């Protein structure tokens, strides 16, 4: 009896009844379901962007499917994707025998980025249609993704000074060498420029150009290879990065909106993300949550104006009482229903008027019952009674604090971490989305749209798999 199995095929032998690509890919292979979901998207605008004429182009829907499959496996190099089209049956099956080269894939990704972002938006609407999105709770958060630019491209005032000092030392050394050589060799060869001086001349041009860009930008630090990226704090220290924002539905962690920004902090992103969610779904979420990085008086006002229930973590503030023995605003109890404040002595302060001070709007509350109050000195009441000027942002802050103290508020704060942070974990760890491959803010937006398109498609796939035929 033979100990090992014999090969069933001889490589050089012709096959009488060759297998089709469809037979070579298992019916349970996820790429089949991926193709089915991708076929539900509308490629009309993308296809109409091709002028026609000349050599026929590769079908854009095929190129999108190939990029989606590659990104799902953490493969974003166009050369690696082109190689997979020659050796991986899943890619061959998805491309239906077409073999676009790496230049075609790279050019398509770069030039058709706007349409790729539209396809991401369609993926959110598809998730809504199949019942994966309920909009009961949407969590918003941001994460830093490193840009193409490396730390070697960073230029600041300090580095420019160091480079100029290094150039000065090189020139001094070169002059000293010239002097010694002149003494030794005389006029033997004075026509060629020494290598050291040729290198330092190019180095000086780079420093001059970096100094010019730094001065024109008005920033402390710039990247000469990718000026749109910004230095941001990441888990690996300060890196040139972009801030990727995502709004995620709590039902199945579908991404409902995304943006890429140059701002390191998240304070200016809430309004834009709410608009993205509404534009992509046509509905307003019941509750929106975000961490304290989104806290600002402006964001609280946005929630108030849109009548949007929000759960934004409120950072702790130092005590309002700056003068010892004098009550601060935090010592006064606010009644939202009656729009009144009650002082520590139990007396009522009622709303009288609004007042503009600088860039802030204040609501003025007056107590006319301060005569004979034993705590008047502690309260700091004036001749006509206690006047309390409350920044409009403070009242919204207190309203948010009261909501977060309720069962619903606490539940929303806890749920936020369970909704949005796993999405970033999946994209960064499983799909290796830690660094962009396209340069500039637009390139970063294109790649982010592709990554979240993949995320949403893979959320829809199980839903379709269990639907009856």
Where in the sequence are the language-model features?
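Anion-binding and metal-coordination hotspots
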Residues: 4-8, 67, 74-87, 96-469
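Hydrophobic alpha-helical membrane-insertion signals
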Residues: 1-32
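A short secondary-structure junction motif
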Residues: 40-45, 88, 92, 430
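Basic, short loop/linker segments at the boundary and entry of helix-turn-helix/winged-helix-like folds
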Residues: 25-68, 73, 396-398
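A generic, residue-level signal for flexible/boundary positions that often mark functional hotspots
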Residues: 10, 15-19, 52, 94, ...
């Amino acid at each position: 009896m033979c100990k090992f199995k014999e090969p069933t095929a001889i490589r050089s032998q012709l096959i009488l009844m060759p297998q089709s690509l469809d037979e070579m890919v298992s019916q349970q292979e996820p790429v089949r379901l991926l193709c089915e979901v991708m076929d539900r998207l509308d490629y009309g605008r993308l296809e109409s962007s091709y002028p026609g004429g000349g050599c026929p182009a590769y079908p854009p829907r095929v190129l999108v499917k190939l990029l989606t499959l590659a990104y799902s496996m953490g493969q974003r190099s166009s050369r690696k994707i082109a190689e997979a089209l020659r050796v991986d049956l899943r890619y061959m099956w998805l491309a239906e025998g077409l073999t676009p080269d790496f230049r075609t894939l790279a050019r398509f990704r770069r030039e058709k980025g706007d349409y790729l972002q539209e396809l991401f938006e369609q993926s959110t609407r598809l998730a809504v249609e199949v019942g994966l999105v309920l909009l009961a709770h949407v969590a918003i958060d941001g994460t830093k993704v490193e840009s193409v630019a490396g730390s070697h491209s960073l230029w600041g005032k300090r580095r420019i000074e160091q480079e100029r000092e290094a150039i000065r030392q090189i020139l001094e050394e070169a002059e000293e060498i010239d002097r010694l050589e002149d003494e030794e060799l005389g006029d033997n060869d004075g026509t060629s420029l020494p290598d050291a001086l040729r290198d330092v001349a190019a180095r000086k041009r780079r420093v001059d150009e970096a100094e010019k860009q730094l001065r024109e930008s008005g920033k402390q630090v710039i990247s000469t290879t990718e000026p749109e990226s910004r230095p941001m704090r990441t888990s690996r220290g300060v890196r040139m990065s972009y801030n990727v924002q995502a709004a995620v539905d709590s039902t199945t962690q579908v991404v409902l909106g995304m943006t890429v920004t140059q701002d390191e902090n998240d304070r200016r992103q809430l309004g834009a993300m709410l608009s993205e969610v509404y534009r992509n779904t046509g509905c307003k979420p019941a509750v929106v949550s975000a961490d304290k990085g989104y806290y600002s008086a402006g964001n609280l006002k946005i929630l108030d104006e849109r009548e949007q229930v929000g759960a934004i973590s409120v950072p702790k503030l130092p005590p309002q009482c700056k003068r010892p023995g004098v009550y601060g605003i935090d010592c006064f109890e606010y009644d939202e229903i009656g729009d009144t404040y009650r002082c520590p002595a139990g007396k009522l302060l009622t709303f009288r008027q609004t007042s503009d001070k600088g860039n802030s709007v204040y609501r003025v509350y007056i107590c006319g019952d301060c005569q004979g109050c034993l705590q008047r000195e502690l309260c700091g009441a004036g001749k006509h009674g206690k006047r309390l000027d409350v920044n409009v942002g403070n009242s919204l802050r207190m309203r948010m604090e009261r909501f977060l103290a309720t069962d619903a508020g606490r539940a929303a704060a806890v749920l936020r971490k369970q909704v949005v942070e796993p999405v970033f974990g999946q994209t960064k760890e499983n799909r290796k989305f830690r660094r962009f491959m396209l340069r500039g803010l637009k390139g970063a937006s294109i790649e982010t749209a592709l990554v979240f398109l993949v995320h949403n498609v893979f959320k829809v796939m199980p839903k379709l798999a269990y639907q009856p035929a």
